A protein has these predicted regions:
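Surface-exposed interaction/gating patches
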Residues: 5-14, 101-186, 229-234
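Acidic/histidine-rich, surface-exposed loop or edge segments in extracytoplasmic proteins
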Residues: 2
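An amphipathic, aromatic/His-enriched active-site/gating alpha helix that lines ligand/cofactor pockets
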Residues: 16-41, 46-51, 59-100, 146-162, ...
């Protein structure tokens, strides 16, 4: 399975049209065969970063499915759709992600992904993009497997997230050493404490992820992303 991760800088006045294009066009068209499915349609929460940044994540069965989809956008039935969508956004930045071997989200049965636009309560996600130190990609991934992932399974008064997926940039990406941690925010009411108070010493001292991970990375970015009510996987 491959993931097509795209960040769209949308024209503010055309935001609703852009959303409709993905719901009624992209999602519905991909549902006609077994190559790909839209998994998520998300907004960067206002007040946490650039305005009108929307994120879409599309799953592709394999490399052949990616080639077929790319060809459809380049010169096939999705060419006119892509041209219309370009009128609704200023820019789009995309990358292909691969799940790491131990990622909870690894192989998705695309046939089970909803494509009918059924609605649900919006879900909040935290997407952490980390860039390990030079030549330390494998060491970062191993430390994330043995340290970070188990730490999220420990339920405490500070628990916030559930780890849903761990992905790395595919060959040819602009930044090879990139890892994406895809997490659901289970306790949104605990976010203010994260923003308004310094982390206590006991969660950033030796033996903690915040401390020990500095051996392999000190550069990462977090995004708070809210799903649309019709986003297929919530």
């Amino acid at each position: 399975m491959l993931l097509l991760h795209e960040i769209h800088t949308v024209a503010g006045r055309r935001e609703d049209e852009f959303e409709a294009a993905f719901r009624d066009g992209w999602m519905a068209t991909l549902a006609k065969d077994d190559d790909a499915r839209l998994l998520y349609f998300l907004r960067l929460a206002h007040g946490t970063g650039r305005a009108y940044h929307l994120v879409t994540i599309t799953a592709l069965r394999d490399g052949n499915a990616y080639e077929r989809l790319a060809t459809r956008v380049q010169r096939g039935d999705l060419r006119s759709w892509a041209a219309d969508v370009d009128k609704l956004r200023h820019e789009v930045a995309g990358k292909i992600l691969l799940p790491v071997e131990w990622s909870p989200m690894h192989d998705i049965d695309l046939a089970t992904v909803p494509t009918d636009g059924r609605t649900h309560e919006p879900v909040l996600y935290m997407e952490d993009s980390a860039w390990p130190h030079e030549a330390m990609l494998d060491q970062y991934l191993e430390k994330a497997r043995t340290h970070y992932a188990p730490s999220l399974e420990q339920q405490t008064e500070r628990s916030l997230l559930t780890l849903l997926g761990v992905f790395q940039a595919a060959l040819g990406a602009a930044r090879r050493r990139e890892v994406v941690l895809w997490q659901r925010v289970d306790f949104p009411e605990r976010l203010p404490a994260l923003f308004t108070r310094e982390l206590p010493a006991h969660v950033k001292g030796p033996g903690t992820w915040m401390h020990d991970a500095l051996e392999v990375r000190d550069d990462w970015q977090s995004r708070l992303l809210r799903s649309a009510s019709w986003s297929p996987l919530g």
